Amino acid sequence: MPTGCEFPMIKTFENALTAADFESTVELTNFPAVFRGCASVWDAYSKWNPFNSGLDYLEERAGSVEVEAMLSRTAPVFNGDIRSHERVSLPFSDFIRFCKQHMRGKGNGSGVDAKSADLNPMCEDYRPGQIYLAQFPILNDEKEEKVLLKILRQDIQTPTFLDAKSLSSINFWMNSAEARSSTHYDPHHNLLCVVSGRKKVVLWPPSASPSLYPMPIYGEASNHSSVGLENPNLSDYPRAEHSLKQSQEITLNAGDAVFIPEGWFHQVDSDELTVAVNFWWQSNYMSNMPEHMDSYYLRRITRSLLVSKPSSTDLRHLSEHIDQSRIEMAEGGNDNIGNESIKKGLSTLHEKASLHDLDPSASQALHDLISLVHDHVNAVDTSKGLQHTSPSCSEGGEKSKFLVNAMSCLEDDRVAHLLWNLEASRLRDVLLAMALELSYLKLLVKMEIFVLVLHKIFETLEALILHMLSPIAAEVLTQKFDEIDQQTGEEDRTQFFREFYSAFDDEAAAMDIILSRKEAFAFQVCSLASLCRLRTYHKLKGEKFSASY
C-alpha cells in the first residue's frame, strides 16, 4: 500500500524469478520487490505454524538450545539501539512456552501477563511480550560457533534466485506478542521471508535520510533513525513531517518475501506469533570494492563534495555544526535505560577469577591498575570522586575534559596504554576478578558484616570505569571486549559480561559511560575529518585556513 511516496511503486512478483532475472530486474536497480508465495514451498511453512502444532515441533527440535533474545521495557517497540534494550539468554523451550502462554491467554481472554510456574527463574523479571527472538543465526559464514539453530536449516530452502549468492547469514525471527522494530537500515542486501503470521513493512530509500534523522555516524547505532514513525516530535525533528511522502508500505502474509536493498530504511510491525527467516548477502557493489581501494574511493567521494563549491554560508553552517556537536557531546544527553540485574549462576569462569589465582602478568596488570587509579583518586576530593553521575547529568566540565583528550596519543594515556598491552584473555580474568570481589564486598556490607579489607582493590573497577576512562581508553576497552567475544565460548562470554556489569550499583550507567566515551572518540575522528575537508577546500582555493580545535 502506498503512503504518499513520490517514487515508483514497489514491484510485486507472483512467480519465482531466475537468478539472472532477479539480478538484472531487481538487485541491480537497488529497489525493493515483493515475492508472493516465495516461502510457501518450505517444510517450515507447515511445520513451524504456531496454530498447527508448530510450537510443539520447534520445542522438540531445538528446545534445549540456549538462545539470546531482545528484552525491551518499552514493548511492543523493540529499538535496535544498544542503550534501549537488553540481551537475555534463555532456553528456546522457555521462549516457546511464552508463546504457548500467549495463545492460552488470548484463547480465554485473560491476557498474556500471567507468569508460568514452569518457566526458568531467570525469566521472572519480565513479561512474555517484552521478549523478541530477533536475528538468531541459522547460518553465519564468519561465526560458525554462534550458529545454534542450524538444526532448523533443513526446514527452509534458499530461494533459487539466491543460489549463486554467497550468503553471509540466515537468521530466525519470532515474537509471541505484537512487536515493532525501530526504523533502520542494514549494510547488506536482505530477503525477509514470513513463514507464519504477518508483517507490515514501511520502506524509505537512502535519499530520505534527511527526513529520518539518522543517529550520529560516530555512534553505536548509526544505522538507526532518531524519529519514531508515529507522532514524531516535529519541534525537534521538523523534516520528519515529510518522511511518509518518501515511504511505501507493504504487507507480507505467510509465505511472502520482500527484497530490501542495502541502505534502505525499513520499519517492521509483526503480528502476534509471527515467525520469519531472513537472508543477508553482500551486494555486488560492496563485493567489488577491495579494501586496498578504500583510500582512493574516499578521496573521490571527498573530491566530489568539494567540486560542489560550498558557499561561504555553507562553510559557516558546517563550522557552527561542528561547534554545536562539540557542545552537545560535552553536555551529554544520553538517556539511561533501566537495566535490572539478571540473577547470576555459577560458571567455570569463577574458578579462574580469584585474585589469588591470577597468573604473574595478570597480577602485575592488576597491581598497575590499582596504582594508576588510586594515584588519580588521591589527587582529587575522594568525597566527590567516587560518586557517580551518568553522562547525561554530569557536569559539562568533566565531559569536556574527556572530549578534549579524545584524540591524545595512545602512549600518553596511561589507562589506554595499559589496556592495549594486556592480552584479552588476561584482561578478562583481571576484570572478572575485580568484579567478583567488588560484588562480594558489597554483599558483606549489605549483611552488615565488618571486614578489614584493602578497599582500594575493590574501588578500582568503579573508579576506572566511572571516572578515569577516557575516550581513547574506552575505544581500546571495547576492542578488547570484541576479542573476548571471539575467544570465549557462548556460556562463559555471557557470564563474563553479566558478572562485570552486575558489580556496578547502576549497570546501565556503567554501560552508558563506556559507550558515550567510545562515541566521543569516534566523534572527534569525524570532526577532524570535517576540518580536513574545510582545510582542503580552502587550499584548493588558495586561501588560508585556521581553526582552533
Curated annotation (Swiss-Prot):
InterPro entries: Cupin_8, JmjC_dom
SUPFAM superfamilies: Clavaminate synthase-like
Keywords, alphabetical: Iron, Metal-binding, Nucleus, Oxidoreductase
Cofactors, names only: Fe(2+)
Residue intervals of the JmjC domain: 125-296
GO-annotated cellular components: nucleus
Keyword Signal among UniProt keywords: no
EC number(s) on file: 1.14.11.-
Tissue expr: Mostly expressed in leaves and inflorescences, and, to a lower extent, in roots, siliques and stems.
Iron is among the record's keywords: yes
GO MF terms held by the record: metal ion binding; oxidoreductase activity
Textual note on the cofactor: Binds 1 Fe(2+) ion per subunit.
Annotated function: May function as histone H3 lysine demethylase and be involved in regulation of gene expression.
Entry similarity comment: Belongs to the JARID1 histone demethylase family.
Protein's name according to its UniProt entry: Lysine-specific demethylase JMJ31
Source organism (scientific name): Arabidopsis thaliana
Gene (UniProt): JMJ31
